[in-house]
Amino acid sequence: MYWESKRNNDQKSLSVDLLDGHYHSKGENKHDTYEVHVAKAHSEYDFIFLSVSHGFVKEALEILRKNNVKGTLVFFCNFWNTRKEVEEWAGDYVYILAFPTAGGQMQDDHLDGVLFDYLMLEGEQKAYISNYTDLTALLTSADLKWEVPHDMVEWIWIHMAINTGVTSTAARSGNLENPEQLALNLMNSSSELSLAIKVIREALKVVEARGVNLKLYKAELLPYKIPAWIAGKAMKIMFAKNELTRKIMTLHNDKQDIFYCCQSVYQTGQELGVKIPILEANMKGISL
C-alpha cells in the first residue's frame, strides 16, 4: 500500500535510489522504479504497513477506515505515545508494532533511501495477531532478519531518546533548513559526538522516569555506558567507515519530524522533573 497525505493520488511511479545493506556490509547502490498502486476502497490486505511522519498516524488510519480498507496493521514508525494510546488509534484493527532499520528522503517523485538487513519486531506473545507466522515468512522471503526486544513500545521510546541526543546536538549549532550539513558537521567531530553521548544519557533518564527498566535493554545501551570521550572517538570512526549509517544520517531531512522527536523527549523530561541541562541547552539552540 502507498499512502502519504501530501502525495498526488494520480502518481504512477517513483524512481528509487537505494543503498541496500541486505547482502553486503558496505551496501550496494541500486536504482529502480517503483510502481505506485493506490489502495481501492473496500479492499483487503494481509498486512498494511503504516510508515508515516509524526502526526499523520491518526490521519492515515482515518483514511483507511473511511475507505473500508482492511488488514493487519503493522505500525512502522516513531511515536512517543503509550501502548494504550496506540490501541485507541488502532480501534477495530488488529495490529503489531515493528520498526524498520531503514531511512531516506522523498523529493517530488524520487526516493533516496538506505536499507539494512534487519528490523525490530514485537514478539508473538505480545502481538495478539493470528497471522504472525505469515509476517515472519514474508520477512524471510525478502531476506530480512528481525530482532525481538523486551517491549516494542519501550524500545521505540529508547530509540527516540537516542535520536534526540544525536539530532539535538547536531541541530543546536544551526538552522534545521540544512539538516544534511548539520549531520555531516556532527559526524566529523569527536567532541560533538561526545556531547551527543551525554545528551543521550539525559534522554534515557526521561525514558526511565516513564517507568522503563533500562536494565532490560543492556545490549542496546552498552555503547552509551563507556566514557563519553572514548565513545565520541569510536562513533566518529564508525561514521567514517560505515557508509550505511553515514548516509542514513545525511538523508534524514524531515525537520518537523526531527523537532517532534526532540520536543517530545524534552517536554516529558520537564513534566517529570528530570534534570536534563544539556538537552535543555540544545533545545534552546534549535532553530526551525
Tell where the protein language model's regions lie, with residue ranges:
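Rossmann-fold dinucleotide-binding core
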Residues: 80-165
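Inter-helical turn/loop segments and adjacent helix faces that build the functional surface
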Residues: 146-147, 182-186, 269-275
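Rossmann-like NAD(P)(H) cofactor-binding subdomain of soluble oxidoreductases
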Residues: 26-112
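Helix-loop-beta segment of a Rossmann-like dinucleotide-binding subdomain
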Residues: 110-126, 173-186, 241-252
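Glycine-rich phosphate-binding loop and adjoining beta1-alpha1-beta2 segment
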Residues: 2-29
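NAD(P)-dependent Rossmann-like dehydrogenase/reductase catalytic/cofactor-binding core
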Residues: 197, 201-288
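Active-site-proximal catalytic alpha-helix in oxidoreductases
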Residues: 153-184, 190-204
